[in-house]
């Protein structure tokens, strides 16, 4: 009997030891109200909103790299444009009847005003500081040559005068005037070449990486906010109460895993968002695929170049190129100094992130999105040809493209820089099989417990309105509450209204945000006279336009 008792006791001890070992090996669990995946501007913006709207919510941000804003949000990995359609010709397409559509331009400009208000509120609240470290006044210009393009720009300028958001824009076809605006663009140019330009003084250059750093630094001051760097998401599990258990690995601690249990999860991981969304298993993810495109820029830091160019000058996309691929020569403020960038030139890699894996594209291809990808490739062969031609460009080809915008450029003043990756959205379509979608898209489950941001353009410049839209989608009841409504109108004074068409409101908003963000702004005295719009633009032929992509 004693032997039997001893044996049973030994078995119990052994089983308990095994159980204790299993418990020790099981991933530890931490709890949080909100889990932000990705340390870029989108997660930082959403976290900043929620910290003010619902300060009792705990938040955790995880980032795979060893610091925030090291991918697409980094200033060197994007164009740094405060996209407001002041110069981007792709936002004002020509209709079949020859007229100019300004609807998208108005939408983009309205969205950027929301971002300006959001950043202004953060400066006034002490969340952000030293506006010149992240936003600076840089005039925005459109520049074209040739009769057809000049006529288009003239008609575009006239059409934009219908909107209060574009007051103060100037138009010129005079070589001397344009040379005064952008000397490098005009010096050495054929004096008989027909050219035209528009210029808006209130354009901006924005360092989205610096904005991200400042927002996250402020969030870290809160006891219930936790930042976990070098932390990779490994899996998702939906719980019975609709919360999520997300397994993550500590890449600096032998990839030790632990579980984060969150009531709401935001996937703001840039190019990696699609793959992570697929891993959640929500049916909404089945509608999407992604196609990665990279971008390169020529960079000059030579003071003789940099000090003689103070503008962002956008051109017209060449025939057969996507509208978004417009070349531009830009003043940038990076690492505390002025530089000039020209590009972009498209590149191809199967990586979804600059620091991603060559297996990203293949591993994101599923039985549900394979055919939509094939359909997009078949339907957009011009786009495929364009990307192939870009990949084949030589250094001489890129320099020749630069000389179209800077005729007296010298090769020794420029170096090539590889910027970030942009994953284009491909969405399943019942009629066409699959369509290429420009822009960003919020994808969430029907319960509103998890959401991801897919897409690339206009991206960071509209982070504030995009995250506002996300909250309206997943926190619908909260957003409708009097408490959140009051706070949202404090953060975004124009919330719930449109500035377009209201001159007084537009000027009030621009004056306020310019003062807080230390930007230049002079109220237009009178609406600029539209130039003679003859000859009229000819109706567009029934040709299929090249699909657009973000670079």
Curated annotation (Swiss-Prot):
What the entry lists under InterPro entries is as follows:
FAD/NAD-bd_sf, MQO
Q: In which pathway does it act?
A: Carbohydrate metabolism; tricarboxylic acid cycle; oxaloacetate from (S)-malate (quinone route): step 1/1
Give the GO biological process terms.
tricarboxylic acid cycle
The coenzyme or cofactor needed here is: FAD
The chemistry this enzyme catalyses reads: (S)-malate + a quinone = a quinol + oxaloacetate
**Could you say which EC number(s) this protein's record lists?**
1.1.5.4
Compositional bias of type Low complexity: which residue ranges?
A: 525-544
Q: Which family does it belong to?
A: Belongs to the MQO family.
Q: Which named protein is this?
A: Probable malate:quinone oxidoreductase
Organism encoding this protein: Enterobacter sp. (strain 638)
List the gene name: mqo
């Amino acid at each position: 009997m004693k032997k039997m008792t001893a044996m049973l006791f030994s078995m119990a001890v052994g089983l308990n030891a095994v159980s204790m070992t299993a418990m020790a090996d099981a991933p530890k669990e931490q709890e949080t109200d909100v889990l932000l995946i990705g340390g870029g501007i989108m997660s930082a913006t959403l976290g900043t909103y929620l910290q003010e709207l619902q300060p009792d919510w705990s938040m955790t941000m995880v980032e795979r790299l060893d610091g925030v804003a090291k991918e697409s949000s980094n200033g060197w990995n994007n164009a740094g444009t405060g996209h407001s359609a002041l110069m981007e010709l792709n936002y004002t397409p020509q209709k079949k009847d020859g007229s100019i559509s300004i609807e998208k331009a108005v939408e983009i400009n309205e969205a950027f005003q929301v971002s300006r208000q959001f950043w202004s509120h953060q400066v006034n609240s002490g969340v952000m500081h030293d506006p010149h470290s992240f936003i600076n006044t840089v005039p925005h210009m459109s520049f074209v040559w040739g009769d057809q393009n000049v006529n288009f720009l003239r008609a575009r300028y006239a059409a934009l005068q219908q909107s209060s958001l574009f007051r103060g824009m100037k138009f010129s076809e005079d070589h001397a005037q344009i040379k005064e605006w952008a000397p490098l663009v005009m010096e050495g140019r054929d004096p008989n070449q027909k050219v035209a330009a528009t210029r808006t003084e209130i354009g901006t250059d924005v360092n989205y990486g610096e904005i991200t750093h400042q927002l996250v630094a402020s969030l870290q001051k809160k006891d219930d906010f936790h930042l976990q760097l070098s932390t990779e998401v490994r899996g998702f599990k939906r719980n019975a109460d609709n919360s999520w258990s997300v397994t993550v690995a500590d890449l600096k601690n032998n990839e030790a895993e632990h579980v984060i249990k969150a009531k709401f999860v935001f996937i703001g991981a840039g190019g990696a968002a699609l793959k992570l969304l697929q891993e959640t298993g929500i049916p909404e993810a089945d509608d999407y695929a992604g196609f990665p495109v990279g971008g390169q820029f020529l960079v000059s830091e030579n003071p003789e170049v940099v000090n003689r160019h103070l503008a962002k000058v956008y051109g017209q996309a060449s025939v057969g190129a996507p509208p978004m691929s417009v070349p531009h020569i830009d003043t940038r403020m990076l690492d505390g100094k002025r530089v000039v960038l020209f590009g972009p030139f498209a590149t191809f890699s199967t990586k979804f992130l600059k620091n991603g894996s060559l297996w990203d594209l293949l591993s994101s291809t599923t039985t549900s999105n394979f055919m939509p990808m094939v359909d997009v490739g078949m339907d957009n062969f011009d786009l495929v040809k364009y990307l192939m031609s870009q990949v084949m460009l030589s250094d001489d080809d890129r320099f020749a493209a630069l000389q179209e915008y800077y005729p007296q450029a010298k090769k020794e003043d420029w170096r090539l820089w590889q910027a970030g990756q942009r994953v284009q959205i491909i969405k399943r379509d019942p009629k066409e099989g699959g369509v290429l979608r420009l822009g960003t898209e919020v994808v969430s489950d029907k319960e509103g417990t998890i959401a991801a941001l897919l897409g690339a353009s206009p991206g960071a410049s509209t982070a504030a309105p995009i995250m506002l839209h996300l909250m309206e989608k997943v926190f619908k009841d909260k957003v409708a509450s009097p408490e959140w409504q009051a706070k949202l109108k404090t953060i975004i004074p124009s919330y719930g209204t449109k500035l377009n068409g209201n001159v007084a409101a537009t000027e009030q908003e621009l004056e306020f945000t310019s003062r807080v963000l230390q930007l230049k702004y002079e109220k237009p005295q009178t609406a600029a006279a539209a130039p003679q719009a003859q000859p009229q633009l000819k109706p567009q032929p029934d040709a299929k336009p090249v699909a657009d992509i973000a670079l």
